[in-house]
Amino acid sequence: GPIEEFDFDVAILFSDILFPMESLGMDLIYDPGPIFKEHLAEENASRILVNKNPISSLEFQGEAIERTMELLPDDKSMIGFIGGPWTLLSFASAKNKLDKIGKIESYQWAILEDYIYPLLHKNISLQLQAGAELVMIFDSCAHQLARNDLSIYLNKILTELVKSFPNQVGYYAKDGVSYDDIFAASDSYEVPFAGIGVDSNVRIQDIFAKRKD
């Protein structure tokens, strides 16, 4: 495979970021890309998000990691992968095409708290127990959030998804998100992100220069 062909340092699990929303009860089909039969809204959330043990339908990810590691040379690393909480909710609510949104609504915070954070916490644990050295959070819609909401949200991620797994959870966002705000949130929290990924459109030299200050 690519690891042998190109001598990459790491392998990463790619499992569609929307599987957790399907696990929670949303009807997801592929035609050819992912399509929800019904999008999430305040009025239907309690009716749609009904699965009592959603993590059980994600156990295939652990098996995929274990099987991949059986084939990896000892000097190669294995990285797990989940979608960011807001990104999952943005796609589930058909807001993922928007550049910006207004404030996160109270019902959206409730969905994050009651459904998405708990499932993703278990999802991270599942992948780490299967042998992943690190799990990356891919938050491709985080740029939609206003600065105040982004700050609150990042602290929630650090509390709900990172604190239990020191040095094992990284974070990536893109498309104009403020990396200054991401680094600030991580630096100020007792258990920071294990690593922060940067958009390919951003000069990594600029990030390094700022981090030296």
Give the ranges of each region predicted by the language model.
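Non-catalytic positions within long, well-ordered alpha-helices that form the structural scaffold/packing
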Residues: 4, 121, 128-129, 184-189
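Active-site-adjacent beta->alpha loops and helix N-cap segments on the catalytic face
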Residues: 62-65, 144-158, 180, 200-212
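Catalytic-face loop-and-helix region of soluble metabolic enzyme cores
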Residues: 162-213
